[in-house]
Amino acid sequence: MQEQYLPSEIEAKVQQHWQDTKTFEVTEDESKEKFYCLSMFPYPSGRLHMGHVRNYTIGDVVARYQRLQGKNVLQPIGWDSFGLPAENAAINNKTAPAPWTYENIDYMKNQLKMLGFGYDWSREIATCTPEYYRWEQWFFTKLYEKGLVYKKTASVNWCPNDETVLANEQVQDGCCWRCDTQVVQKEIPQWFIKITDYAEELLNDIDQLDEWPEQVKTMQRNWIGRSEGIEMTFQVEGSDQSFDIYTTRPDTVMGVTYVAIAAGHPLAQQAAENNPVLAEFIEECKNADTTEAAMAAMEKKGVDTGLKAIHPLTGKLVPIWAANFVLMNYGTGAVMSVPGHDQRDYEFATKYGLPIVGVIKPADGELDISEEAYTEKGILFNSGDSFPELDGLDFQAAFDAIDAKLSSEGKGKRQVNYRLRDWGVSRQRYWGAPIPMVTLADGTVMPTPEDQLPVILPEDVVMDGIQSPIKADKEWAKTQVNGQEAFRETDTFDTFMESSWYYARYCSPKADQMLDPAKANYWLPVDQYIGGIEHACMHLLYFRFFHKLLRDIGLVNSDEPAKRLLTQGMVLADAFYYTDDKGARVWVSPNDAKVTETDDKGRIVKAVDSQGHELVYTGMSKMSKSKNNGIDPQEMVDKYGADTVRLFMMFASPPELTLEWQESSVEGAHRFIKRLWKLAHDHVSQGPTVALNVASLDSAQKELRRELHKTIAKVGDDIERRQMFNTAIASVMELMNRLQKAPMESEQDRALMQEALCAVVRLLYPIIPHTSFELWQALGHEETIENVLWPVVDESALVEDSKLIIVQVNGKLRAKVTVAADADKDTVEAAGMAEEGVIKHTEGKTVRKVIYVPGKLLNIVAN
């Protein structure tokens, strides 16, 4: 064993061994318990960042730990390789997205190998390959045949100058990123999958996800948004037209003083034909930002359509207003407005001089709506002559009474609604999987026949930054179906499609079908899934939805795709900037910032860069290109080794919390590995050891062995049950401190050190696998560490021969005594009373009572 710890040599050697022996390639084996560990696969952007490294290190630690439990462990990797960044890079670099993507995959693959992640590379997938998206296209056609796919018009960002659709990321301050033209909203036909058909199951099955974070489950419940209410019909005065409104607060219906409809509602469009003010308002609404955040912040505006609605219970007329806070694609596109009991309605009514009527009062007081709406549930009053029996009812009683009345008159019905909308999967981009639908010459729309799949995306293209190459190339869309001329769909799939089923494809990545059911059902569900909480409501919901679709088509037999979910926190780093001559912020890398002053708590006060600019320190923030505060993993591995980077990542913070990057702490992790290496080297250099004779150990040796086996138990529990990897590492570090001070004089001292080091190396193997691999060999083992089991706790070693008892007099500490572990109260009392500190404080006093807490405390009450 070499004396010096040389990570670059060790890691290259061990990684070559793993590659040569295909250590992490696995097949189905019914005789072994399986464990499927999966980290969310990366987008091949060009280089790994520290967020990737944290995610994949956590996954690798879990996978390697489970391997040492004797399980058949699958840990695959691949590339989420379609998407807009590749198009933008292709435009900037005057190339096609495909070569840029494949070059990035090659580079990042080498980075992943450099970090020592134990992936089964034989299962590698890239979602941009026809071998992958062929089966996504096939699956879509099956969903269409089952009635789960439909086409309807939906709003998109449209650049009138370039005549092209823009992704949200390409809209900057309301303008096109390329030509700065004002972006407008345009309705175009798009494909949707009926996720709403599964809304109830998706919601109810959240209760099965016992090992998912509560925060993620709450976010999904809120996103699905189940509500119980009443849908009621309002007639339009002087017309046979009507419209429906859904409300979860039917108890307030007697307080409706106006109705608000979306600018895109047919009634608003119709009224605008003779109302230029309304027509102008509708045009203004077309170009509004309709994201939730924007809707919440925007000024609430509206225009009276001139139409009146007939209240379904009172028969009174209420005005119909077009309002910018109602969306046509949400609910029915119309809401009943009760300003007395809804704050938004209150502010709108106040602004436009509309009546405000109170019909709900607190159960224990008077109603006051002079300054704001009363929005709580309470007791109904002021219900009027048309339905006086509502007065005095509480919410539920009123709900039932109003439901009964509307149902009997055919004007409404009780209904369960969901906030969740169907999934629009069309994207007017090039770099995505073509949607496998065709339109025949006679206008018939149908799926691409199975024998024509995959519909291959041409990769040899030129990106002009304006139009998708497959939209620009009219010949590409032309095809033949059943002897007829047909035209292919030129939209591509939302890239969430690819990431919704990749986990299942890993089970049989080379199968000539979407999934091999036998293999999929061996590996699925995923036992441990790891990724960021930012995916809670999109990817993780589609991921669950697709699994249910796969189940219902007969490809898998489980209800949920993943048993356990860990959402790792972000990686933060110091961020610095200076302001240039034009007043713009120039962000400076932490590597180029020299701290010149700190306060008494060590916080940065002043810093300069290498060119002398005085820097503003903004604190720790998420590593990002925009703030130039990313740390290149390659640099850190070159400087300290992969094991050091991995150890720091796992030790610096609990996995679900943010991790603050501090190079001084990285250096600390490196020093710890060097200490371990030195301890092992010093031990090995003294030659072979004799067998450990537990029966002959003295008390100090027994105590050290007890600490060893306590540590084995704690580390296993911390990794498997608690997933507190940082405390597991801290326990090993504490044990290491004990081992470094342990005597090495006798044969049994060295035999005990051999047992301890063999255990420590296995405890650390999931975290620092290269170092552990090498040390395991150095400790005299022929079999490689991947093929051995996690150390077993010797329960007999945990049994203590003696106990330390705290001795108090009148509740104050006066002595500590060591007694036999099985000592009774009388023995402990005698030992305690003999202590000098106890004698001093009981002398001349009468002992009134002796309280003994077995194995812990003796309290003598004397006065």
From Swiss-Prot:
One Pfam family recorded for the sequence: Anticodon_1
Keywords, in A-Z order: Aminoacyl-tRNA synthetase, ATP-binding, Cytoplasm, Ligase, Nucleotide-binding, Protein biosynthesis
One Gene Ontology term, aspect cellular component: cytosol
The reaction(s) this protein catalyses: tRNA(Leu) + L-leucine + ATP = L-leucyl-tRNA(Leu) + AMP + diphosphate
Record localization: Cytoplasm
Entry superkingdom: Bacteria
Mitochondrion found in the keyword field: no
Q: Which Gene3D superfamilies match?
A: 2.20.28.290, 3.10.20.590, HUPs, Isoleucyl-tRNA Synthetase, Domain 1, Valyl/Leucyl/Isoleucyl-tRNA synthetase, editing domain
| Short sequence motif 'KMSKS' region: positions | 622-626
Q: Which residues are involved in binding ATP?
A: 625
Q: What is its EC number?
A: 6.1.1.4
The Gene Ontology terms for molecular function here are: aminoacyl-tRNA deacylase activity; ATP binding; leucine-tRNA ligase activity
Q: Which InterPro entries match?
A: aa-tRNA-synth_I_CS, aa-tRNA-synth_Ia, Leu-tRNA-ligase, Leu_tRNA-synth_edit, M/V/L/I-tRNA-synth_anticd-bd, Methionyl/Leucyl_tRNA_Synth, Rossmann-like_a/b/a_fold, tRNAsynth_Ia_anticodon-bd
Q: Which PROSITE patterns match?
A: AA_TRNA_LIGASE_I (PS00178)
Predominant cellular place of this UniProt entry's protein:
cytoplasm
Q: Where is this motif: 'HIGH' region?
A: 42-52
Biological process GO annotation list? Answer: leucyl-tRNA aminoacylation
Task: Tell me the protein family, please.
Answer: Belongs to the class-I aminoacyl-tRNA synthetase family.
Q: What is this protein called?
A: Leucine--tRNA ligase
Origin species: Shewanella loihica (strain ATCC BAA-1088 / PV-4)
Its lineage reads: Bacteria, Pseudomonadati, Pseudomonadota, Gammaproteobacteria, Alteromonadales
Gene symbol of the encoding locus: leuS
